[in-house]
Amino acid sequence: MMATRRTGLSEGDGDKLKACEVSKNKDGKEQSETVSLSEDETFSWPGPKTVTLKRTSQGFGFTLRHFIVYPPESAIQFSYKDEENGNRGGKQRNRLEPMDTIFVKQVKEGGPAFEAGLCTGDRIIKVNGESVIGKTYSQVIALIQNSDTTLELSVMPKDEDILQVLQFTKDVTALAYSQDAYLKGNEAYSGNARNIPEPPPICYPWLPSAPSAMAQPVEISPPDSSLSKQQTSTPVLTQPGRAYRMEIQVPPSPTDVAKSNTAVCVCNESVRTVIVPSEKVVDLLSNRNNHTGPSHRTEEVRYGVSEQTSLKTVSRTTSPPLSIPTTHLIHQPAGSRSLEPSGILLKSGNYSGHSDGISSSRSQAVEAPSVSVNHYSPNSHQHIDWKNYKTYKEYIDNRRLHIGCRTIQERLDSLRAASQSTTDYNQVVPNRTTLQGRRRSTSHDRVPQSVQIRQRSVSQERLEDSVLMKYCPRSASQGALTSPSVSFSNHRTRSWDYIEGQDETLENVNSGTPIPDSNGEKKQTYKWSGFTEQDDRRGICERPRQQEIHKSFRGSNFTVAPSVVNSDNRRMSGRGVGSVSQFKKIPPDLKTLQSNRNFQTTCGMSLPRGISQDRSPLVKVRSNSLKAPSTHVTKPSFSQKSFVSIKDQRPVNHLHQNSLLNQQTWVRTDSAPDQQVETGKSPSLSGASAKPAPQSSENAGTSDLELPVSQRNQDLSLQEAETEQSDTLDNKEAVILREKPPSGRQTPQPLRHQSYILAVNDQETGSDTTCWLPNDARREVHIKRMEERKASSTSPPGDSLASIPFIDEPTSPSIDHDIAHIPASAVISASTSQVPSIATVPPCLTTSAPLIRRQLSHDHESVGPPSLDAQPNSKTERSKSYDEGLDDYREDAKLSFKHVSSLKGIKIADSQKSSEDSGSRKDSSSEVFSDAAKEGWLHFRPLVTDKGKRVGGSIRPWKQMYVVLRGHSLYLYKDKREQTTPSEEEQPISVNACLIDISYSETKRKNVFRLTTSDCECLFQAEDRDDMLAWIKTIQESSNLNEEDTGVTNRDLISRRIKEYNNLMSKAEQLPKTPRQSLSIRQTLLGAKSEPKTQSPHSPKEESERKLLSKDDTSPPKDKGTWRKGIPSIMRKTFEKKPTATGTFGVRLDDCPPAHTNRYIPLIVDICCKLVEERGLEYTGIYRVPGNNAAISSMQEELNKGMADIDIQDDKWRDLNVISSLLKSFFRKLPEPLFTNDKYADFIEANRKEDPLDRLKTLKRLIHDLPEHHYETLKFLSAHLKTVAENSEKNKMEPRNLAIVFGPTLVRTSEDNMTHMVTHMPDQYKIVETLIQHHDWFFTEEGAEEPLTTVQEESTVDSQPVPNIDHLLTNIGRTGVSPGDVSDSATSDSTKSKGSWGSGKDQYSRELLVSSIFAAASRKRKKPKEKAQPSSSEDELDNVFFKKENVEQCHNDTKEESKKESETLGRKQKIIIAKENSTRKDPSTTKDEKISLGKESTPSEEPSPPHNSKHNKSPTLSCRFAILKESPRSLLAQKSSHLEETGSDSGTLLSTSSQASLARFSMKKSTSPETKHSEFLANVSTITSDYSTTSSATYLTSLDSSRLSPEVQSVAESKGDEADDERSELISEGRPVETDSESEFPVFPTALTSERLFRGKLQEVTKSSRRNSEGSELSCTEGSLTSSLDSRRQLFSSHKLIECDTLSRKKSARFKSDSGSLGDAKNEKEAPSLTKVFDVMKKGKSTGSLLTPTRGESEKQEPTWKTKIADRLKLRPRAPADDMFGVGNHKVNAETAKRKSIRRRHTLGGHRDATEISVLNFWKVHEQSGERESELSAVNRLKPKCSAQDLSISDWLARERLRTSTSDLSRGEIGDPQTENPSTREIATTDTPLSLHCNTGSSSSTLASTNRPLLSIPPQSPDQINGESFQNVSKNASSAANAQPHKLSETPGSKAEFHPCL
């Protein structure tokens, strides 16, 4: 409603009231007010009276109170309507601006003001003749302070002030916005409340009932609102001026539901009496009271203690009635609240002024409410005739009972509470100016809205609660009452009001409707009792709807949201709904629905997606429980929602803002649940509401309540002196009749309204707002509720929530104590009570704890959902007195609020808060808030993150906090005086169910006690042991939950822990168990999550925070802010825990539990490494095979809890994969990588040093420079990995494989930098590999000699890995984590590698371009020569290559892949490959064969080397990308260079079928074949380049079949079944690679001399590879490639690692073979255009101009070799990628491969093109029989043909597309190549998709097919050709292609198919 800004200014300064936005323009409000008043009774304003004050030394002797009046909801509605209609939009808008109203807060007796007759509550109209309208509070203060000795004030006497008479509801707002209120001094209300005309219905459709003005403004005419938002004048209230017992116009329900089961909640500010005939009502009241309490209480206390007292009396009087199951909310005379027929709230009678109606109910008999329920309405006001009371406070109290349980001052207090966030309100005003303007009244409106619909539909109980709350708490107070239900509802309404506001408010109403808000929100219930549910829904909802809207907007406290919810034009006022439920006394199922409703509302709150949505569901839920009405409610809620919701939301937000700054924030949060959390105040509500979406119904209510609670607590702090009164007032709200649903799921409807919550949260100033219900009354209600709760203890979570007032704020400690029996959840003193109120929510809370925060607080003891309350606290800034209890609550909330971020956290926080709040309520709120049981400076460190994760000391630093224990809340302040608003992390920690013990293991500090609550675990260091024990004792005393054994448990725990302390002084790790035990206890008691300690809502801080914390672990936290900052990090690092205190994972090495042998080594590392060494040295793929994620996570959690219990013999420690993954995970999660962040760049740079020795020395120096823990751990780990690598023969984990696994994990930066991951991956691999290989040297003082050797190997590795890694990275990217090899540590590796194209990428792209160019040239050449002699030695080649070295193996794999691909491509390719193989391998192969296939053969050979290059590239994703990019070209090239395709195929075949022979052949034929090979390489390179762009992998496969193929093949083999092959073994040995590489290269060199040169280089490389292989398979594999390319070496290193794994090798080999074949086919197609470009590029990169086949290639031979090496490396990466992709498939393929590489080739070929394979086969034959020189000649012939044929081939391919047949493949060398290319490509294209689809199936085939698809797809014609040929060949090869991608085993089928083709 109105934000109360209470400024405790000195007499003079008291004037500092910001009346900042008293928009005169909100005079449209005049209409609403006027209508309302006129309808009820014309206001006759005597006019302002002028008081002249003389300044004295003491000033003027008065202080001012600043209320921001937000535009009434109706005004907002009008404004919306007008805006929609184009009418007075501007005026409306202005009207909607929040208006500053300044009231006399205090008049010093004997002071000038006192003598002049200035009275408390007088509203300042003019200062020295200047109107305050439009002036900000500060401006008015300035005017006063700047006045001369004489100050002339024009004041509107409080009793005559419309705003005050109206109780700051709708009408108050309207009046505030009307000129009458300020200027015209219209006829003042006659002193009698009854005579007080209802304020003009600014926009209050519910104007008919005057009470709506303040308490019930929105709901007063909900029908009007829903019917016509402007129906303010609609006499919804039968007697607008009377008690507003008016039946809601729309459907005066024939049956007073409330009567039948009325929980009459008389919401008196002082006495929020709720006659709760049923538990429902009681629950409502208590919940409501809780919420209402803080905001109203503060206000009440501020403005009228006596009033509170009278109210208190009333409350007590009514309290008994509360227990009465009367359906009537007796409208008792001014001090008392009675149940009225309408039921819970007098609301039934008063739509216009719920509060008044309620208060009237209190004051009058049940029927009386109709007469004077609303102060807003003349009735209410007249019912409470200020003249009848001796003291203004009495009058206010009584009037509050009648009007809305709020006097102007009360409202001002609540406004001030909101006003405290005046800025926030203003802020929100922009967002929801209308809302703000109305927030005060809207708060109520809102409550009714939510309440109406919700109460009605889902849970009558909640409705009643909401209604009561709505009605009673006009702004804050009403909010308090309705707040519980409205609270969540309101916040939802607020922010989601547009969408879900109504539903939410309805929910609030549902929970709190029956409860008269202290503001008289009961009125909102007004005639609800008289209405049928449907009628209520319609009429009440309509009127309340508007009212609710108004209330929601004006008094966010009001749970008017339901009416809003009932967006159908019925504005089921939340009260009406609640009233109905109140009246109806919801049956148990209905009660349950109420809870559900609340829950839904909570969800709605938490779900920004739409209040309307939630509202609807809420309503629906209610309808489920409430029968039809709920359904109706839902409709109205949704329908009106649109109408009111939209209008409402802003006003509601403002309302809430007025009520609470927090609420205002909350409003935003409503719109965005996150926002809820964002705002310190609002977040508690919003966060609670927003975050626990699952419990939306209950949570929503809870949230709202929470905020009010926070506010209230704040207010309490502010009004500690007034605490009792506040509590009393709050008690009114607490009196919310919250009937527990039979299901026991009491919705937290009684939660305070958001406005109330906002007021409370804003509280610094708005403490008063919360004080509307006397604590006594509230306590009585609470007691009853508690009794009910106890009775239904089985459902304490729901019931306690419903029963426990969210913000009980017991004014009198005695009452609180009385209620103490009531479970803490029931008797949460101001804040605690709130939490218990929330107790009802816990079930929902678990879903969305934040929403339930408040309810959780109530419920907390049972369910422990304090997070909601905590949220409000943390998010809400309250006055200090409010803070006292609520700050705890708030602090808890802050902590909880953080928790709120996660349901788990919220849940825990809520529980904690709940306990705390329970305790607070139990002790008195005054005790809690005004009195700190203990306070002092303590060093504080959270042990558990918000997410429930344990945090290491390093994660969260110690901070010195001023700790104040109030009641059950422990508040942490940065400094003594900061208590008003602890930071969000300093939210009060609820100690209700806490376990406190001395902490020994958590920290090294002394005198540290650990406080374990349901939602947090923290350490406090006292100055000395005595202080620590005193704290422990005090906390223990405060920790008992009211009705739970938690306190005893806590004491026992403390005693036990103290004993343990003595026993565990030296034991650091046992305590974690104790904390866990305590957690268990806590969990058991509070229902906290399991493992709260480790999973406590604190999540690990960021690493920086962690570092700070770890550094400061022993020192007290120096900066609380820092600590807070760390919380998010902690949350992020949830899983990074220290084993002992904070877990093992995610904590710094120095924080990890040390190993027993070496304190610098983490225990986990020691254990895992030892276990692996004990059991896993012979375990194949150890560290590469990932463990079960669930098992790993489970073990991580256990280890994080503490490593003391580690039982290595446990079965869970039996899984070596899990253990190895655990180790990798540990290093991966290190906040500071093993190679520290600051050294990372140095390591990378050192690794890149060209001088091997220098590199090693630099690395060694850097290693020795590492921190001790890092150095020792690295040393230990390196030794371990070295040990593992030493067993690589069995475990297949060579240093390279281990490096691949651990490199990215160990060598990394804390921040995930994809660029680094990509560009540095080779370096990471190499560094780790180097460490493994030279561990002894690195970790010894001297080792220069060894570094040299190491350097050589390293250099080899380097040159190879870089390109390989780039490609590997690419492949990894493609493959993702599929390769088991890379899986664990490689998870990051693969992830990183995905993007690690950085440096390698550039290189690779160059290679691709060059390769493409080469490939193009090669294809051109090949096309004529492309036919290769089929060679049966393909398998041999594969075997040989695989056997050779790792490098060769990789090459073989590539070749094999190429061969497979060739086979897949078709027989032609196979023939070509065979020819190549023959040529390369078997010089003796008939030249005829070569000649026949010569054209293809030579080209194939040439393409083959390019293919190797390409293959090297192809492994990289870039290859695929290139393929995609160039696919059109490449397809063309492929078409044109079918021979090249064949060449790649032949290369593949060579590598596959005759790797050994090929190697030998290459060696033998190195001379002339080398020339050919040079040419062939050039072609292949061209093709490869082209392919690499299009399908570099394929080309590379073909070319690299011989060169890179071995490596790739090795990789493929290692991945595939090839792993079983001799090759893989040989590769492991390192032998095959050399031979393979050499033979490979020579095979290609047969094509050209340049190729020879290239082959020579390759051979050299091979030799190096051999050496390396001998030294290390990886090294060897790389060795052969090393000389050619360092970067490639690096890539190769990683490739080798993969390669080393037999499976990976096999797979990569197969995959590469496939890729090669496909790539060749594609390359040939692409070659024409791309090949040239790529050749050129590649020339620039590694090869000369391939376009000049002979000379250029010979020149290029080296570059080509390098390029090819790079390609090979790429192929290798590809192979690794293949391995990744098809480990399993490769295995299957491996079988096939083992059976015969040829089969694979055939299969691959079949996939690509049976024809191609046939051609390849011919090539093989020719190669075998023919000489390579003949191939060279053929190549030369083909070259010219190729250039010509590039075009002709394209055409030919087009033709071939049609022809595509096996015969095509075998056609003339030129023709066949072309044909082959088309058909092969067609097949390849087709196959490629298949292969791509089946990438996992066969690495090589996958690569090939993938490359090919890339190529084939872009060029449609080639694709078509491919498609046709594929169709033709596909028939033969498609099955193979399809299956083959899955398996190479399909090779037989494809082979068979190929044979037919042949």
Curated annotation (Swiss-Prot):
Protein's cellular compartments = Golgi apparatus membrane; Cell junction; Cytoplasmic vesicle membrane; Cytoplasm, Cytoskeleton
Q: In which tissues is it expressed?
A: Widely expressed with higher expression in brain, heart, skeletal muscle and placenta.
- Other remarks on this protein: Depletion of ARHGAP21 induces cell spreading and accumulation of F-actin stress fibers. Required for In1A-dependent entry of Listeria monocytogenes into cells.
Q: Which domain of life is it from?
A: Eukaryota
CDD domains for this protein: PDZ_ARHGAP21_23-like, PH_ARHGAP21-like, RhoGAP_ARHGAP21
Assembly and interaction partners:
Interacts with GTP-bound ARF1 and ARF6. Interacts with CTNNA1.
Query: What's in the GO CC field?
Result: actin cytoskeleton; anchoring junction; cell junction; cytoplasmic vesicle membrane; cytosol; Golgi apparatus; Golgi membrane; plasma membrane
Q: Where is the Rho-GAP domain?
A: 1147-1339
Supply the alphabetized keyword list.
Cell junction, Cytoplasm, Cytoplasmic vesicle, Cytoskeleton, Golgi apparatus, GTPase activation, Isopeptide bond, Membrane, Methylation, Phosphoprotein, Ubl conjugation
Annotated region described as Disordered, given as residue ranges: 1-42, 286-325, 418-458, 659-751, 859-885, 1086-1133, 1348-1401, 1418-1575, 1598-1642, 1655-1686, 1860-1958
Q: What does this protein do?
A: Functions as a GTPase-activating protein (GAP) for RHOA and CDC42. Downstream partner of ARF1 which may control Golgi apparatus structure and function. Also required for CTNNA1 recruitment to adherens junctions.
Q: Tell me which InterPro entries the record gives.
A: PDZ (IPR001478), PDZ_6 (IPR041489), PDZ_sf (IPR036034), PH-like_dom_sf (IPR011993), PH_domain (IPR001849), Rho_GTPase_activation_prot (IPR008936), RhoGAP_dom (IPR000198)
- Which portions of the sequence form the region Interaction with ARF1 and ARF6? 930-1097
Induction data: Up-regulated upon cell differentiation.
Annotated ranges, domain PH: 931-1040
* Membrane topology classification: Peripheral membrane protein
Phosphoserine modifications at: 36, 57, 459, 612, 616, 625, 717, 857, 862, 881, 924, 926, 954, 1099, 1115, 1418, 1432-1433, 1504, 1527, 1669, 1742, 1917
Keyword Magnesium in record = no
- Residue ranges with Polar residues bias: 286-295, 306-325, 418-436, 659-687, 1349-1362, 1603-1612, 1671-1686, 1874-1909, 1918-1931
Modification Omega-N-methylarginine occurs at: 554, 575
Please report the name of this protein according to its UniProt entry. Rho GTPase-activating protein 21
Which terms under GO biological process does the entry name? establishment of Golgi localization; Golgi localization; Golgi organization; maintenance of Golgi location; organelle transport along microtubule; regulation of small GTPase mediated signal transduction; signal transduction
